[in-house]
Design a protein with these regions (language model features):
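A short, Trp-centered hydrophobic/proline-enriched beta-strand micro-motif
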Residues: 6-21, 59-63
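Acidic-histidine catalytic/liganding microenvironments
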Residues: 11, 56, 94
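Short glycine/serine/proline-enriched coil/turn segments at secondary-structure junctions
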Residues: 23, 68-70, 122
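Hydrophobic/aromatic beta-strand elements that line small-molecule binding cavities or substrate pockets
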Residues: 29-32, 76-78
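Charged, gly/pro-rich active-site loop segments
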Residues: 73-134
């Protein structure tokens, strides 16, 4: 597992920042999986966050790990992917999502990763650890 993935697991909940025209929007997320050294996330196709990312794919993910009092900044460009294996991994880890994303509801899960990305772990003393991303 990568340091990025481990940090997100430790934090549990992380926050995704997008732009709605000139207004920043931030919301909590928790779904993520790692495959082939890349981190993948998911949002619903029926949500504003999805439309915001389509319009402006530059986003930032921030997570805070309370035990160490460190936080993660993961910034990059959203790229949506069609990956049945990642989708299945997400459903295995979060089976309740099958109740939301299915043919009956008509809602689709949109899977994304970040490209041209940087990731840093920071602490309150100003220390910065740059993470190597695949």
């Amino acid at each position: 597992m990568s340091k990025l993935h481990d940090f997100l697991n430790e934090a549990g909940i992380f926050y995704l920042a997008t732009a709605d025209d000139d207004q920043p929007k931030v919301r909590p997320l928790g779904a993520h999986v790692e495959e082939d050294g890349k981190e993948y996330f998911t949002v619903g196709d029926f949500k504003e966050v999805y439309r915001q990312m389509v319009k402006n794919p530059r986003v930032e993910i921030v997570a805070f790990e309370p035990k160490t009092r460190r936080w993660l900044r993961y910034t990059g460009k959203v790229v949506f992917v069609d990956s049945p294996s990642v989708e299945e991994k997400i459903f295995q880890e979060l089976p309740h999502l099958r109740q939301m994303y299915n043919d009956e509801t008509g809602y689709k899960m949109k899977i994304f990763t970040l490209e041209d990305a940087t990731a840093k772990i920071l602490d309150m003393q100003g220390n910065v650890e740059e993470l190597e991303l695949k």
